[in-house]
Each structure stands twice: as C-alpha cells, then as structure tokens.
Amino acid sequence: MPKIIENIREKLLDEARRQVMELGYSAMTIRSVARACGVGVGTVYNYFPSKDMLVASFVLADWQECMVRIGQSCRECVEAGSNLKHPVGGSVCGSNEVDTALRSIYDELRRFTEKYRTLFQDESAGATFATSFPQRHKQLRSQLAEPMQVFCQVQSRVSPDFLAEFIAENMLTWTLAGRTYEEIGSILIQLF
C-alpha cells in the first residue's frame, strides 16, 4: 500500500526550489528531490513529468503571487485617482498615482527577479529553456501589461494596449538588468 504524505506536491516544490537556489539547476535532479522528501522517484513523476516542469511549477507559483500584488497596485491607482477627470471625460489616475503604481509594480518585479536571480543566471538552465524563451517572454510581458491597461487609458497619443506592453517590456528588461526604479521611473512617467 502506498504511503500517504500530506502536502507532498508542496514539499516537492519547496525542496526543488531549495536545491536549485543552493546547488544550481544542473545539480537538482528528480532523484535528489525524491530522496530529500523521502519518496520514490515515481512519486515525483506522478506530479511533475520532468525536471523542467518541476522548476517551471515553483517559478509559476511565485509569478502568480507577484501578479496578484501587481493587479492590486493597479486597482489602487484607479481607486486613488477616481476623483480626477481626464480632459476628454472619464476618471483616470493622476501622475502621482501612476508613479506610485509603477514603483509598486517595479518593486514587485525586483523582488521576483532577485529571488530567482541564481536560476536566471544559471547557464545550464539558460541552455535548457533557450528554445522556449521568446514565447515565454512574450507571455510574461502580456501578463504584466494586462493590469496596467487600467491606468494606461489616460494616454491618448498611443494605444493603451501598446503603452502597457511597452512599459511591461521595459520593466522586465531593466529589473533583470538590476536597475532601480529611480533610474527608469522618471522616463516612464513622461509617457503619461
């Protein structure tokens, strides 16, 4: 009879994350995660079909939490600026509210990228995920842009969809490069 282990999926994810961060991507294996969790290799494969899916699963869980906080920042921007009126009509965020939202979003991205900097800079992980990078990057940019569209409505010179994607692309690029909000915030706020 198979043994029942409570929260085994979470334990596997936590152990895989720990090993990747402490030992590196190439050192973490399905076997090492199984051994550390006291389960058979087959048990890990019941939850994750590959090492790459195991890694993607713990990164995705943290990304989703990051996106919840980013969405909240964008909603707060709209709520804080709900008494401000755009010259063409309708409620919008003011520049202070937009700056606060952009800073909050950037800070969330910085926390996420700092948490996974070891993984993002790991050469063997980079080689493994190189083929899927363009597709995943586009997906991340779109996910990041979506909540920002609510305050990009104020900008009438360009499409709000494009403006949100433009800001998202810059934030992704510069957080990964280790730049601070102070370095790019004054440029981004000029778009509004």
Model-identified regions with their sequence ranges:
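Alpha-helical DNA-contacting segments of helix-turn-helix folds
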Residues: 54-62, 120
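Basic, helix-initiating cap at the start of DNA-binding domains
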Residues: 1-23, 27-36, 53
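Hydrophobic/aromatic-rich alpha-helical bundle segments in the mid-to-C-terminal region
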Residues: 121, 151-192
